[in-house]
Amino acid sequence: MACAPGALGHRALWAVAWGLLLLVPVLAGAQRGRKKVVHVLEGESGSVVVQTAPGQVVSHRGGTIVLPCRYHYEAAAHGHDGVRLKWTKVVDPLAFADVFVALGPQHRAFGPYRGRAELQNDGPGDASLVLRNVTLQDYGRYECEVTNELEDDVGMVKLDLEGVVFPYHPRGGRYKMTFVEAQRACAEQDGILASAEQLHAAWRDGLDWCNAGWLRDGSVQYPVSHAREPCGGTGSTGAGGGTNGGVRNYGYRHNAEERYDAFCFTSNLPGRVFFLKPLRPVALAGAVRACAARGATVAKVGQLFAAWKLQLLDRCTAGWLADGSARYPIVNPRTRCGGPRPGVRSLGFPDASRRLFGVYCYRAPGAPDPAPGGWGWGWAGGGGWAGGSRDPAAWTPLRV
């Protein structure tokens, strides 16, 4: 039976309407798949919706980054001046640190964020936070909370940093550090304890290390790219799946009694690392004086790793570092420089009184230039560094 044109039109409209109603949840799910969106619905008016998209942003030490956060609600029911914006950092699963709070014209940053954090203020509904001079300690997850009277909503943003993970143990030997001592050791070498995510990313990038170390969450793990018996065996399954390698995990350990090495993380250098080549080998004390005479300090382990990874420092000569170890960075592997893989080679911790090596120095930005008038460094003897204009070829600063 043929339908009347009018009836067909009404049925077509109802079909389209039902199709749209069914399509809305699908579109909403797709939208949530693209960005972090948290919804709290409080009726037809006054609903607060917070969006933090993208859910992860990447910066580097010394950089400036925007932690995105936008909110929307019925402005007719509430004015924007009554909205409180609060940023916090997740320091533990159930612990938070205040970062920034704003209520109308009143703004306040807290602790280490003072002078570095401010709202972006890109129009109504923008709660994004601008963070300047990013530090290693800024790495982590942040919550953006928007509160209006009894209504609130929260979005999450993760701040990641470009950098490098490096294994570390002090002169005392392997497996000597508690969790707190590992934190301190990383800080002394211009780093922080790496996160499990950072260690996993380093493993995917080829990090292979057969000694277990503390991570920032209190777990103990180690990355194995090439499975072998001394490193968990050839049949162990790590975080990467399969039996050919992975991140071996000892789980969460007693942080005051058990002792391991550390996996540290560091990021971009604000200054530069360079190598000073002596006329004759020097002891560690002489290396310290040589760097000081060049307006620099002896480089830390993390600074050398950052110069190798991020500034491509390549030098096939061992040099003293601040912790008393001797190392050298290789970007382009060659046989005479430690084997077929790039990395920072370590010669361990030689006797500091022995005259064996040159030195890797670190010069911070804005450090005063050495006194003009020759190549002298203000000290004589004690290592035989070239002085004056007598032998300018006897030292080699490598700028990166």
Curated annotation (Swiss-Prot):
Example of a GO biological process term: synaptic transmission, GABAergic
Annotated PROSITE patterns: IG_LIKE, LINK_1, LINK_2
The Ig-like C2-type domain, residue ranges: 47-155
Signal peptide coordinates: 1-30
Link domain boundaries: 164-266, 271-363
CDD domains: Link_domain_HAPLN_module_2
SS bonds (residue pairs): 69-144, 186-264, 210-231, 291-361, 316-337
InterPro entries: C-type_lectin-like/link_sf, CTDL_fold, Hyaluronan_bind_Proteoglycan, Ig-like_dom, Ig-like_dom_sf, Ig-like_fold, Ig_sub, Ig_sub2
Glycosylation sites: 133
GO cellular component: extracellular region; perineuronal net; synapse
One Pfam short name: Xlink
Classification via SUPFAM superfamilies: C-type lectin-like, Immunoglobulin
Tissue expr: Expressed predominantly in brain where it is found mainly throughout the midbrain and hindbrain in a perineuronal net pattern.
Phenotype upon loss of function: In deep cerebellar nuclei (DCN) neurons of knockout mice, inhibitory synaptic strengths are reduced as compared to those in wild-type mice, whereas the properties of excitatory synapses are unaffected. A reduction in GABAergic pre-synaptic terminals of Purkinje cells are seen in the DCN neurons. Mice show significantly attenuated perineuronal nets formation in the DCN, a marked decrease of brevican (BCAN) in the brainstem and cerebellum and a reduction in synapse number in the DCN neurons.
GO MF entry, a single one: hyaluronic acid binding
Broad class of where this protein is predominantly found: secreted
UniProt keyword terms in alphabetical order: Disulfide bond, Extracellular matrix, Glycoprotein, Hyaluronic acid, Immunoglobulin domain, Repeat, Secreted, Signal
Subcellular location field: Secreted, Extracellular space, Extracellular matrix
Listed PANTHER family: AGGRECAN/VERSICAN PROTEOGLYCAN, HYALURONAN AND PROTEOGLYCAN LINK PROTEIN 4
Protein task: Essential for the proper localization of brevican (BCAN), mainly as a perineuronal nets (PNNs)-type deposition in the brainstem and cerebellum thereby playing a key role in the formation and structural organization of PNNs. Contributes to the formation and transmission of inhibitory GABAergic synapses between Purkinje cells and deep cerebellar nuclei neurons.
Family from the record: Belongs to the HAPLN family.
Protein name: Hyaluronan and proteoglycan link protein 4
Source organism of the structure: Mus musculus (Mouse)
